[in-house]
Amino acid sequence: MIIKKSPEEIDKMARAGDVLVATLDLLEARIRPGVSTVELDTAAERFIRSRGATPTFKGYRGFPGSICASPNAMIVHGIPGPYRLKSGDVISIDVGVTLDGWVADAARTFPVEEVGKPAQNLLAGTERSLHAGVAECRPGNRMGDVSSAIQSAAEGAGLAVVRSLVGHGVGRSMHEDPQVPNYGKPGKGPLLEEGMVLAIEPMTTAGRPEVRMGGDGWAIFAQDGSPAAHFEFTVAITAEGPRVLTPWKRSAEAAPPPVEEVARAG
């Protein structure tokens, strides 16, 4: 069942989104060679809790981390651990924040220092596909309009869309109906209505779309070992069109601490 939200409830989700975006900004400032993914996780959890929120992922279906940290060919659901970032890596950071009972969910894939042109194209093309999908999140459109826009933008950049992983509704729970595929046909699928809130999240690879499960039962990898990217917004469908609740611009209220404080956080 699709649960629609009132404007007041969407505002509450946006406040969770403010904390989430500030968390991603904090982590971006820490991403450099030699930093371990568990250090990023520790800094994220500390920051989220300092803002009166909780990390949604921690304990969700037994997941042990506060964030998902997925480097290189790992597409999603990476458990933070001892892996230390290297120059030339790409790393997806997926964060969920719960504030006053409402969830926001977003992800970005970051380069570690300088990356080659294929990786630059991977990140830029996947982010463009996210924005293409968001632009279709309007009342009266169909889910297939969103899915097709994502697919067209990603494949137009020469990327493979991972078909076995999808976006989803979000609200008081992290995963709600409907599913949001990253491929499809315009005019097909559920009708988009005012009050729906969706996690739009293209996941792509620079190679083939097939995936494999990692040995820990969580991490999902590109089967061919090609680098992968994941970008995600939480988006509310309003009468005026899409409202991104996790934009890269943060509010002053939830702004991250200065860089010197970030350096002490982990």
Model-inferred region functions:
Residues M1-G266:
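Active-site neighborhoods and metal-handling regions in enzymes and metal-associated proteins
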